[in-house]
Amino acid sequence: MKKLTILFLLISIFSCAQKAELKKEISKITERKKATVAVSVLGIDFPFQYNNNNAEKKLPMQSVFKYHIALAVLDLVDQGKLSLDQKVFIKKSELLPNTWSPIREKNPEGNFEMSISELIEYSVAMSDNVGCDVLLRLIGGPKVVHDFLISKGAKDTQIVYNEELMQSAWKNQYENYTTMK
């Protein structure tokens, strides 16, 4: 609940902030950094873009794609196809050894159940790679998330790989991308 409150607080701050002040703050944070920065905040009354030079640049999402996975899962919950209380069985073989996973640390022997709401929390709030891949398995894979995003009007966004495959080759991270458009 605390995390949800913080999220809504951040959304409120963004929606109330002045665009010029926000650009100034972003510039202050990013100046002198060797980084490609593109920020986009979309809202009914608050469209905002920073650094239009990078607007069309395909940026790897890396762990940010876990948010998109959560959206696709929650859409299936809204449709009544899944339930947040629904338990999902996690096999020991899914607890990949060389990846970040608080789930694996908590349950090293595998073969246990977690609710969808717990998997979302671990995936989004703790960036758990195992939880992410379990959610993707549950809903049918990265293509389901990609198709969901396209159906909601997302443009210039692509999700091809789960965490396991994204980490198997350096170049794969660039196939899960988005732009600020």
Predicted regions and their residues:
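Bacterial Sec-dependent N-terminal signal peptides
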Residues: M1-E21
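Beta-lactamase-like hydrolase cores
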Residues: A17-P60
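Active-site SXXK
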Residues: L59-V88
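Alpha-helical scaffold elements that line and support the substrate/ligand-binding pocket
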Residues: K66-L76, L119-V145
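Conserved catalytic neighborhood of penicillin-recognizing serine enzymes
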Residues: L95-D133
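Mid-domain, small-residue-enriched loop/turn segments at the edges of structured enzyme/sensor domains
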Residues: C132-K181
